């Protein structure tokens, strides 16, 4: 956990309410030397449902295959350290404290949100610790989320989108899908999970505007569920997926999204 002194500074600097705005985060990252440019290749995940589970499946598969993986997720359940994993381990207390203190010092007591300062600390930690890949979950929305200063992700993933956080993201599914699609970067590929038709139209429109190659559920890949597991099939492969440890049909869908992401990356 962060030290008492760090928590006291948090109380002094954090604004009262959430304010979706990239200006504060961009300013702090510049002061830190733009660590987002020096991180291992990033997989950036946005959506309404299943983000954490997709990242958990990706991490497990990659680590079992021998890769070193950094992870940034939220919220934490018990300990603040759960938000940042370095090379398969929760970030150590002393390292977390050091990275946070650096971010707080360079922020120079200017207003910044709890999530922004945490994201900056994660990016700084990732930039200074070798790994094969970073798995990064958005906090809220996509377009104006603090994580969205990643410039060239190896891959973006859009999990199922539904109505959420309308106060911050705007009313209606189209508006929310447009905000989530804000993580798409020009020319960088994206995996799209099963979506409602309204969300699909918005995501495909956003992808066309930015020249983003899409790997979509129901088009470039699909999955069918059986009692013994699931059958995953893409344009390039066919795989039998075992039942995941996490219960529920939705978790089998989440596992298939993770497999689709790795299947796509395996082509390049």
Model regions: which residues?
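Short glycine/threonine-rich catalytic loop with a Thr-x-Gly-x-Asp
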Residues: 69, 246-258
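ATP-dependent carboxylate-amine ligase catalytic core
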Residues: 16-18, 22, 26-39, 64-151, ...
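Acidic, Mg2+-coordinating active-site environments of NTP-dependent enzymes
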Residues: 130-138, 153-242, 255-268
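A conserved segment at the C-terminal end of the G1
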Residues: 44-45, 53-70
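Aromatic/hydrophobic pocket-lining residues that form π-stacking "cages" and hydrophobic walls in ligand
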Residues: 58, 122, 202-203
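Pre-Walker A (Motif I) flank of P-loop NTPase domains
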Residues: 38-41, 188
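Charged, amphipathic alpha-helical linker segments immediately N-terminal to NTP-binding catalytic cores
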Residues: 1-18
């Amino acid at each position: 956990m962060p030290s008492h002194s760090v928590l006291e500074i948090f109380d002094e600097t954090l604004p009262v309410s959430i304010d979706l705005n990239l200006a504060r985060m961009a300013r702090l990252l510049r002061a830190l030397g733009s660590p987002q440019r020096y991180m291992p290749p990033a997989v950036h995940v946005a959506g309404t449902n299943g983000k954490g589970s997709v990242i958990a499946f990706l991490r497990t598969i990659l680590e079992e295959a021998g890769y070193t993986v950094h992870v940034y997720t939220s919220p934490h359940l018990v300990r603040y350290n759960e938000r940042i994993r370095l090379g398969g381990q929760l970030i150590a207390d002393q390292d977390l404290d050091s990275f946070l203190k650096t971010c707080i010092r360079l922020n120079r007591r200017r207003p910044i949100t709890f999530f922004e300062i945490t994201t900056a600390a994660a990016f700084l930690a990732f930039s200074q610790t070798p790994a094969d890949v970073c798995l990064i979950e958005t906090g809220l929305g996509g377009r104006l989320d603090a994580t969205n200063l990643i410039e060239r992700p190896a891959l973006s993933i859009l999990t199922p989108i539904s109505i959420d956080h309308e106060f911050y993201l705007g009313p209606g599914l189209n508006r929310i899908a447009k905000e989530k699609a804000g993580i798409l970067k020009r020319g960088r590929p994206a995996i799209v999970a099963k979506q409602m038709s309204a969300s699909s139209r918005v995501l495909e429109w956003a992808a066309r505007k930015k020249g983003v190659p899409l790997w979509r559920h129901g088009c470039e890949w699909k999955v069918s569920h059986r009692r013994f597991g699931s059958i995953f099939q893409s344009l390039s492969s066919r795989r039998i997926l075992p039942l995941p440890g996490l219960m529920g049909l939705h978790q089998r869908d989440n596992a298939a999204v993770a497999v689709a992401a790795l299947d796509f990356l395996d082509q390049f």
